[in-house]
């Protein structure tokens, strides 16, 4: 019974966390005003704060956390290591490197989707390298070492780009990207990321039996 209630309980807790995030801000908002803003009964100011600032920010954090949790669980099964996390194979660092390139060369000024597309391409490039390595070796340790090498290379390249940043604004954008932030998010940005998150989660959930089998060993 406890196992059956665990997932519904966690979902309920996460929904409560999103609602609590809508209460908090530079000016705390009572729960009744937040609910009124959700259902259209509040004034224009409250609706603007909830629908344009706090709710997109909360949903962005929620989806990001869910994606990191799912990918981390999948990597723990794949690598048979309870400490594995999304950055262990260098995918996160490669995504950051490509995003930093787009910021360095000003590609984000050409189109608002240039930055996330660059990050996705970086992640796919690292994933392709790891997949090619996995064809040649079945050693988990080798894959982890390749991932560590990718992360180190990406980190060094990002440091070089920051040192060569053409202006303070580009440097600030690079640092903000590397640190990460859910501030100033919008539903358009969430809509851009959501299909990839949903597709990835679906693939991992469909592969959960195979990932569970891998925890038994390479044989």
Give the location of each predicted region.
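Alpha-helical transmembrane segments in inner-membrane proteins
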Residues: 1-219
